[in-house]
């Protein structure tokens, strides 16, 4: 009788843990389904890393081409071309990699959720673009990089409501860096490079390690 009780105890315990594991699996599956339906999860860590590399390449080109003897108008035009080229390359890369990831995760890329995330990201970016044009027109060149960092950070925080919450922390980092740059004159390119180059690469690596490696 004692042996039967012992066997019954171990069987019941094993059944309990099996049911517990199944319950946890069910909870995780439900959580994944809810995230797919309420958040844009096709964000790619590689896209952030490549965006950072593009920014570093653009900053390097700027330091090699622009010299103290370069005319101010030529310098501004060249910097504008570099910034727009980096933005375009990063946007195209992010779009392609996000589309490829959406095919793997089963989330529709062209969905209402995607458009909402893009809209919340684009609105601060467009506003920042208008402010940057105004700065150029009034020749307040020293705060141009600060404004770019600040509004990009705001765009990330605003878009994080519809994607991974960690995107907001990247946005906060950009906002803090832009705020510091406002009071540190003469180092605009350095702060721009740290933000758009270093922060993107660091975030992309951490994002891959925390999210994508677990999914693969």
Residue ranges of predicted features:
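Terminal transmembrane helical module of multi-pass membrane proteins
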Residues: 155-216
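Helix-coil boundary and interhelical linker segments in multi-pass alpha-helical membrane proteins
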Residues: 61-78, 133-142, 184-188
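Hydrophobic alpha-helical transmembrane segments of polytopic
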Residues: 44-54, 82-87, 121, 145-148, ...
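Membrane-proximal helix-loop-helix units in multi-pass membrane proteins
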Residues: 108-167
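N-terminal juxtamembrane cytosolic/stromal segments of multi-pass membrane proteins
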Residues: 2-44
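Selected alpha-helical membrane-embedding segments in polytopic membrane proteins
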Residues: 39-128
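Membrane-interfacial segments
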Residues: 69-70, 100-105, 135-139, 210-215
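Helical transmembrane-bundle signal
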Residues: 52-62, 87-94, 125-129, 149-152, ...
